């Protein structure tokens, strides 16, 4: 059952990110078939995740998938989730994780999908940690990838982080992704970084898809257009 849940979450997340980009000959299936699949999976997700918490499976990805799917979800579902996030953020004094800054990005994306401003959640600015370049990229390429996706999810300005050793900019995250592109054209979690091991020289479809999503907004930059 756990595998099916994970597949369902991943399916709706992928569809929620790509549905709006498929048109005409680009679509492998008809729009009606795609919409039916989205609705069926969203219904399953809604029935399965009745009380979303702060976390990956059963949390932000479920909220994002449902919000982007167009499925008819009661407003109270999102209101209760936001209240849960607010209580969680207050309980940990605004510090979601001391190492993995994708924790902030994931929550930001989910909040943006339901129309909430991540810059004031229980009095805490959840975008601020993403202003720390070194800490954001520490966990691998998913750090800068999701920082860009999160900040662009609501067109947040780049947050100032006085405590950062290196203040981040959007361009720095873009450049980080580009410089880590592998010879085969894709990306992997640690490929192109100092932490890379022998297996990181081969593209990972998951990370590659994330990288393309993060760079999609920046196609006006020649280096981005060439890389993608």
Model-derived segments and spans:
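An alpha-helical repeat/solenoid feature that recognizes helix-turn-helix modules
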Residues: 48-74, 95-119, 136-170, 175, ...
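Bacterial N-terminal signal peptides that target proteins for export
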Residues: 1-11
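Sec-dependent signal peptide cleavage junction
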Residues: 19-33
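Alpha-helical repeat scaffolds
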Residues: 76-89, 120-134, 162-170
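Bacterial N-terminal signal peptides
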Residues: 12-20
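Intrinsically disordered, low-complexity N-terminal segments that are enriched in acidic
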Residues: 32, 48, 86-93
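Short N-terminal segments immediately surrounding and downstream of signal-peptide cleavage
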Residues: 29-45
């Amino acid at each position: 059952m756990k595998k099916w849940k994970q597949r369902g979450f991943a399916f709706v997340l992928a569809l929620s990110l790509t549905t709006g980009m498929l048109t005409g000959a680009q679509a492998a299936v008809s729009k009606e078939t795609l919409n039916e699949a989205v609705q069926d999976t969203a219904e399953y997700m809604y029935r399965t995740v009745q009380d979303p918490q702060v976390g990956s499976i059963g949390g932000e990805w479920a909220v994002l998938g449902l919000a982007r799917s167009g499925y008819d979800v009661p407003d109270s579902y999102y209101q209760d989730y936001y209240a849960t996030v607010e209580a969680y953020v207050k309980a940990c004094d605004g510090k979601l994780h001391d190492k993995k800054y994708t924790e902030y990005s994931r929550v930001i994306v989910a909040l943006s999908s339901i129309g909430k401003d991540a810059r004031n959640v229980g009095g805490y600015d959840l975008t601020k940690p993403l202003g720390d370049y070194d800490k954001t990229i520490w966990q691998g390429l998913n750090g800068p990838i999701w920082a860009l996706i999160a900040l662009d999810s609501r067109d947040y300005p780049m947050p100032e982080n006085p405590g950062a050793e290196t203040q981040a900019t959007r361009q720095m995250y873009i450049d980080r992704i580009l410089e880590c592109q592998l010879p085969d054209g894709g990306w992997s979690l640690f490929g192109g970084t100092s932490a890379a091991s022998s297996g990181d020289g081969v593209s990972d479809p998951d990370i590659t898809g994330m990288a393309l999503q993060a760079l999609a907004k920046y196609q006006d930059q020649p280096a981005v257009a060439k890389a993608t």
